[in-house]
Regions:
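ATP-dependent carboxylate-amine ligase
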Residues: 3-185
Length: 185
């Protein structure tokens, strides 16, 4: 981009000034907060096995400790991907925490069970409440660790129920991670 801009005659100072104002895309490897231990917490929309693997791969080179991943799978959606999501997290994360992510009209426990079925013999932490799962990840993250909260990204609600009973409960992974980091002793 820089070379192309300069080759069109745009002054270098103008190009560099524009670059300083670039903003990251909300919910795509968005750095939410640093834990008190100094571990960065990232939020990403990764809600498929390939996207989860890509997000983990993008962060892995920057981890000197553990890569802690919080994730789930949406209800009333592609049920076949759930075991694959579990397999990816179990194989590629150092600590995987399975939680709820827009269960909609499905039983959240059954969604988590389908994810866990793909984890093999790997030890996985299951925490139903998304806020509690994020709090656990933030709490256990130490120096050199990175936390990835995957699945919701830019979304600002947790979808539960279906039809007339459907509700969207306020929930923002970035805000929750910041709150959890602020509540740490």
């Amino acid at each position: 981009m820089l070379f192309r801009s300069l080759s069109t005659g745009i002054p270098a100072a103008t190009v560099l000034d524009s670059l300083t104002r670039l903003q990251p895309v909300r919910g795509r490897l968005e750095r939410a907060v640093l834990t008190r231990a100094g571990a960065p917490v990232y939020v990403d929309y990764a809600h498929t096995p390939d996207a989860l693997a890509a997000a983990i791969a993008a962060l892995r080179p920057h981890v000197s400790g553990k890569l802690i991943v919080v994730f789930g799978a949406g209800g009333d959606r592609d049920t076949g991907k759930r075991p694959d999501m579990g397999r990816v997290a179990a194989e590629q994360a150092d600590v995987a925490i399975v939680t709820d992510d827009n269960p909609r009209g499905e039983d959240a426990g059954e969604i988590r069970a389908a994810i866990l079925a793909g984890c093999g013999d790997n030890e996985i932490i299951e925490i139903p409440g998304r806020r509690e799962a994020i709090a656990k990840a933030v709490m256990i993250a130490g120096k050199g660790d990175i936390v990835l909260i995957a699945g919701k990204g830019h979304e600002q609600g947790q979808i539960v129920g279906r039809g007339e009973d459907m509700r969207v409960l306020p929930f923002d992974d970035v805000i929750v991670a910041s709150e959890c980091a602020g509540e740490m002793p």
